[in-house]
Amino acid sequence: MQNKFSLPTQDEIVKRLKKIPEGLWRECSNCHEKFYYRRAGVYEVCPNCGYGARLGSRKRIKLLCDEFEEWDKAMATDPTNIDDEKYKKKLATGIKTTHVNESVLTGKAKIGNNEFAIGVMDSRFIMGSLGQVTGSKIARMFQEATRQHLPVIMFTASGGARMQDGIHSLMQMARVSDEVARHSAEGLLYIAVITDPTTGGVTASYAMQADIIISEPKTLIGFAGRRVIEQTINQKPPKDFQQAETLLKNGFLDDIVERPNLKEYLNNLLNLHSDK
């Protein structure tokens, strides 16, 4: 009987591989395990270690909020005032990738019966850097939340101050911090949800000024980068350095919440602090 099966040639294997759609298999950036993309689910969480992949601001709001009304949608960095061509290209790429005008999306949202102001930073937009317009949008969000007597939930994700904006970027730390203080003085709740990565000036200001500070698992949280610290102290920090779990253990965080549980967790906090 003639064998009908024959091994494919190298050329045939290459042709077959080209027909396989891209993105079916993913590699976790935390544990580096490979897995079939559907196993991550709608929340984009690694099935092996529980690390949540970096989400865009619009997707995060879609997963979290029952209703959302965007504020300051038209606010954006004006490219005509920029001489740096590389910066212009980065802005254009950020807008194309994220479908937002800046590294933060702000607005009024609702979970269940609870209304609140929300800000979501997008690490895909120039690494979520804190630029002049970013700071303006966040400051205006706190101002409007104070005016409407709303709690604030802020999702941070940032590489720090935006170098291209110079001193104007650094000024946003003080500007936003001032509005956080005004909001707090009115007895209003501020919850910070720190997501991967949150570093630099954002960590040094409004990310750590909230009444309740929580984080997703295995989030990188710090000020200076690991390499800078190593060069400064001439020592290698431990592996768990600048990890959310280490910060929780040392009292810098109030809790670590897995992404699929965030909506219910935040709704419970809003219920507990509601004045209705």
UniProtKB/Swiss-Prot annotation:
Cofactor(s) of this protein: Zn(2+)
Any one GO MF annotation of this record: zinc ion binding
UniProt remark on cofactor binding: Binds 1 zinc ion per subunit.
Enzyme class (EC, first level): transferase
Gene Ontology CC terms: acetyl-CoA carboxylase complex
Pfam families: Carboxyl_trans
UniProt main location, coarse: cytoplasm
GO annotation terms (biological process): fatty acid biosynthetic process; malonyl-CoA biosynthetic process
Pathways per UniProt: Lipid metabolism; malonyl-CoA biosynthesis; malonyl-CoA from acetyl-CoA: step 1/1
Keyword Nucleotide-binding attached: yes
Listed EC numbers: 2.1.3.15
Subcellular locations according to the entry: Cytoplasm
InterPro entries the record matches: AcCoA_carboxyl_beta, Acetyl_CoA_COase_Trfase_b_su, ClpP/crotonase-like_dom_sf, COA_CT_N
Reactions mediated catalytically: N(6)-carboxybiotinyl-L-lysyl-[protein] + acetyl-CoA = N(6)-biotinyl-L-lysyl-[protein] + malonyl-CoA
Span of zinc fingers (C4-type): 28-49
Binding site for Zn(2+): 28, 31, 46, 49
Residue ranges constituting the CoA carboxyltransferase N-terminal domain according to the UniProt record: 24-276
Keywords: ATP-binding, Cytoplasm, Fatty acid biosynthesis, Fatty acid metabolism, Lipid biosynthesis, Lipid metabolism, Metal-binding, Nucleotide-binding, Transferase, Zinc, Zinc-finger
Role summary: Component of the acetyl coenzyme A carboxylase (ACC) complex. Biotin carboxylase (BC) catalyzes the carboxylation of biotin on its carrier protein (BCCP) and then the CO(2) group is transferred by the transcarboxylase to acetyl-CoA to form malonyl-CoA.
Quaternary structure, from the entry: Acetyl-CoA carboxylase is a heterohexamer composed of biotin carboxyl carrier protein (AccB), biotin carboxylase (AccC) and two subunits each of ACCase subunit alpha (AccA) and ACCase subunit beta (AccD).
Similarity remark: Belongs to the AccD/PCCB family.
Protein name: Acetyl-coenzyme A carboxylase carboxyl transferase subunit beta
Gene name in the database record: accD
